[in-house]
Amino acid sequence: MENKYIKTYDNVLTKDQCNQLIQKFEISTDQQVRTEMMNHRYFTEININQHKDWEGFVLNLYDIFRPYVETYKKDCNITYNQWPEKYGFEQMRFKKYNPDGKDEFKSHVDVGDYASARRFLVFFLYLDDNEEGQTGFDEYDIKVKPEPGRLLMFPPTWTYLHTAYKPVKKPKYIIGSYLHYI
């Protein structure tokens, strides 16, 4: 099944650029935080906006994402009166899901309370290929396969329940952010 507002864009980054980001993540062990919420979400992450040594990467990624906002609007036939005149990016989180049978983010939405209600568009940038570890939208029978440089964009609201499935053979690396109302 297809959904008008779930879009992917390939080759947003090259494989080399993706590998550089993964290598930087792996050597930044002192910045990594383990997230574990019983029976719901398990992964290791870095909020890369909070670390000076990631600043160049962050600015570059924002520059890369900006044209895709316009592409997304065009591809979804979004008109000027449907889109905020001003918006900003949320801080970026770099996540690693290990193939340990545990790491996943079970079915959820990305707007669940007042604090997250500013979000209106999700960005997931996949950094490696993975036979498993898809992002699934079960209601729409859509599974997005991780590929290096693939960008997934969709609304974060209750109509877009999604799951980060467990990787099986190797880790899955993604960078995520959101567009915010300002």
Question: Which residues does each predicted region cover?
Answer:
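Short beta-strand segments enriched in hydrophobic/aromatic residues
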Residues: 25, 98, 111, 127, ...
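Non-heme Fe(II)/2-oxoglutarate
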Residues: 1-86
